[in-house]
Design a protein with these regions (language model features):
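A conserved FAD-binding loop/helix module that cradles the flavin
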Residues: 293-298, 303, 443-474
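Glycine-rich dinucleotide-binding loop and its adjacent helix/turn
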Residues: 123-139, 198-218, 241-303, 419-433
Length: 490
């Protein structure tokens, strides 16, 4: 441990963001660079706890106190070695992870937690700058061929791990560029796409084969893949959006959030000349209070929307934890994103009733009613508040209320993978009902976080490697703690 009283001596600091009035004019990342001296101070705040709950909070099991100590001592090779032992892509999670590790930080009981996400990002970027992250192809090949379908974070992680195990990996992507949700779902002001391109170029050097513009069932059939490859990983995400199912949701101008966000990312990436869904000069309603809804706010502000309102069915969370939500649980508190800072009205405890439209079939308004949440029989339910129903202007609406499961496009069935009633595939140890076909990420577990997708890709790779070779030398999440501890101790 570098500084025994660092958590007392230094306060939590995070990067300064660019002025909202300036940054809404571009799609660049919003945060300014963070100085090396300040980063060392933030790493020094880690208490090197006897029981580091941050491990448990991180789906990847990142060995956080150890890499914090390495950063404090400016041992960048050690820091990236520790971080990469559990996380294939710290440059992604260091930018877009909601940091459940920080919510579990012991310091967070009565102080601000350690800025773990910031430290993680800076380890990755420093390692790239110093040439510490470079192509590392496997020394031997097994002669086995693996197909990975879907190039989101789960597919990329599975491909990376399986390639390191010595298998010949081909990653199939239906879109023009690699990245899946990272590429087409997350705005550039949160994750600029050169970050993905840099990693993909590295994986290509290491031997991973990328086949873009390749949609299973069109460009190539599932049967052909099953015949050509020794095993398959399906990792195409949970892309089926949850519908609002209210009257008038067929009007022009009512869209699922990913239609809007995906097209905008295609514009920035040079795949489209302009976004066919424009928020310029429009009264925008965002239905759903999560991160995807927040991304719609930020993008609409950059389009020049006349007004933006975000609606949330649930009640407004408290600013601080309350007694029924103690540490180390995920804090159910009010969160203000960078997009909220740029401008939007937020309304909580509100129910959408009906879209209204004109004779041309265009949406013009949305009827709302306030609701009151009450506990009945140990369960929370809501009631409409009489006299609060009203219709507000709405020229453009984005539905961002989550996803129900994998896209219903017949992909699972084509590969012989049976599904459950909730549309998720049946699986045991990441293996589908077709022994040759494995599952990873949101496609297997349902909608989740990028960090969970990477974890899923890693765990799936171990089970697939065992299927092909009988045993696997790839690290499992739990085993990696002991491996890294031994390396550090040695």
């Amino acid at each position: 441990m570098g500084a025994k009283e660092g958590f007392i001596q230094f306060k939590r600091e995070t990067p300064v963001s660019r002025d909202p009035r300036e940054r809404v004019n571009d799609y660049r990342e919003i945060y300014e660079p963070f100085s090396g001296e300040k980063l060392n101070e933030q790493a020094a705040r880690c208490m090197d706890c006897g029981v580091p709950f941050c491990h448990n909070g991180c789906p990847l099991g990142n060995v956080i106190p150890e890499f914090n100590d390495a950063v404090y001592n400016q041992e960048w090779g050690e820091a990236i070695s520790i971080l990469r032992s559990t996380n294939n892509f710290p440059e992604f999670t260091g930018r877009i992870c909601p940091a459940p590790c920080e919510a579990s930080c012991v310091l967070g009981i009565n102080k601000d937690p350690v800025a773990i996400e910031l430290i993680e990002k800076n380890i990755a970027e420093k390692a790239y700058d110093l040439g510490l992250i470079k192509a590392n192809p496997p020394e031997k090949r097994t002669g086995k061929k693996v197909a990975v379908i879907g190039s989101g974070p789960a597919g990329l992680a599975a491909a990376d791990q399986l390639n390191q195990a010595g298998h010949e990996v081909t990653l199939f992507e239906k879109d023009a560029k690699v990245g899946g949700l990272l590429r087409y779902g997350i705005p550039d002001f949160k994750l600029e796409k050169w970050v993905i391109d840099r990693r993909v170029a590295l994986m290509q050097e290491e031997g991973v084969i990328f086949s873009t513009n390749t949609e299973i069932g069109h460009s190539i059939q599932a049967d052909e893949i099953l015949k050509t490859f020794d095993a398959v990983v399906l990792s195409t995400g949970a892309a089926h959006p949850r519908a609002l199912n209210i009257k008038g949701d067929h009007y022009k101008g009512v869209h699922f959030a990913m239609e809007f966000l995906g097209k905008q990312n295609q514009v920035i990436g040079g795949e489209l000349a302009e976004n066919p869904i424009s928020a310029e000069g429009k009264h925008v309603i965002v239905i759903g209070g999560g991160d995807t809804g927040s991304d719609c706010i930020g993008t609409s502000n950059r389009h020049g929307a006349a007004s933006i309102t975000q609606l949330e069915l649930l009640p407004k969370p408290p600013k601080q934890r309350n007694f029924i939500n103690p540490w180390p649980e995920w804090p159910m508190t009010l969160k203000t994103s960078s997009s909220h800072e740029e401008g939007a009205e937020r309304i909580f405890s509100i129910l959408t009733k009906e879209f209204t439209g004109n004779e041309m079939g265009e949406v013009t308004g949305l009827t709302l009613v306030d609701i009151e949440w009450k506990e009945k029989g140990g369960r929370m339910s809501f009631e409409e508040i009489p006299g609060t129903e009203r219709t507000v202007p709405c020229d453009l609406a984005f539905i961002a209320i989550g996803y129900t499961g994998p896209a219903q496009n017949g992909l699972l069935q084509a590969f012989g993978a049976e599904t459950m009633e909730n549309s998720l595939p049946k699986s045991k140890n990441y293996q589908s009902t077709n022994p040759k076909v494995f599952l990873a990420g949101d496609m297997r577990r349902g909608q989740s976080l990028v960090v969970w997708a990477i974890s899923e890709g890693r765990e799936t790779a171990v089970k697939l490697d065992e299927y092909l070779m009988g045993t696997s030398s790839l690290p499992m999440k739990d085993e990696s703690f002991y491996q890294v501890d031994e390396q550090v101790a040695g």
